[in-house]
Amino acid sequence: MIDSNGEVLGRYNKIFLIPFGETIPFSDWFPGLAAWLRKNIANLSEFERGREYTAFSLNEKIKLSAPICFDIFSPAVVRGMVKNGANLVVNLSNLAWFGRTTASGNMVAVLRWRALENRVPVVFASNNGKSVFIGADGKNLSQQLGLFEEGTLTARIKIHPRFSFYREYAEWVWGGFMLLFLLLGILAHVRGKIFKL
């Protein structure tokens, strides 16, 4: 993050790396395979993932996090940023290499979920269009640019703390679902035995 005077205020390192696009999976466990891949695949990237859910203070009221591109596909990344104080999420994405596909639309759909899960507004800025401002309720706060449409968007964003059950208790939500499915499985198994008698 750089301020208007050109001073570096902080740094965020991408956490959710794309296998073979940004990292070689399990390269620590299979160093021979990783070495072979590096030798035989041109332009293979191998970044180290970030470890901090960075939130930048813009002023007393606004704390911004900027998950990069596919970081938003990990609910834990955005949740960690918001739990670390972010009350605005700005996602920057390079989706041009997907061409004229549904990738950008899918990205916007995922961003709506991140806004709803964490009850924070989200700004999506992409180099291939579909950029949009999304409110904490998942609704558009601005028009949405078309695919590969250049333009400028403005919107009024309400920054205020809102409670999110998911953000605060995600582990319990997932644990509850696992318990529910376990109980349903046991019930189905028991009922199946009863009806066979």
Regions found by a protein language model. Give the residues of each.
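Enzyme catalytic cores with a strong preference for nitrogen-chemistry domains
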Residues: 1-197
